[in-house]
Amino acid sequence: MNLGFGILIFVLGLVIGLVIGFFVARNSMKSYLAKNPPISEEMMKSMMMSMGQKPSQKKLNQMMAQMKQQSEQSQKK
């Protein structure tokens, strides 16, 4: 009886730790991606230049705002 209770406590602690760890990791990853987006203005600028477009600051700002809006919408879901 004592051994079974110890195993039960161990398994419950492991499951609770995994659930808490998952949510902490997810929250920290979301905040990291919000602070450091995976693509920057410089990367967009070079991408547009390689496609043969002349990147203006207005276009870059529009694209960055559009990406930010899409990421906010996906976080709400």
From Swiss-Prot:
Residues 50-77 are annotated as: Disordered. The keyword Transmembrane applies. The keyword Ribosomal protein does not apply. It comes from the Bacteria. It is a single-pass membrane protein. It is found in: Cell membrane. The chain crosses the membrane at residues 5-25. Coiled coil: none annotated. GO terms for cellular component: plasma membrane. Keywords: Cell membrane, Membrane, Transmembrane, Transmembrane helix. Belongs to the UPF0154 family. This is UPF0154 protein LCK_00994. It comes from Leuconostoc citreum (strain KM20).
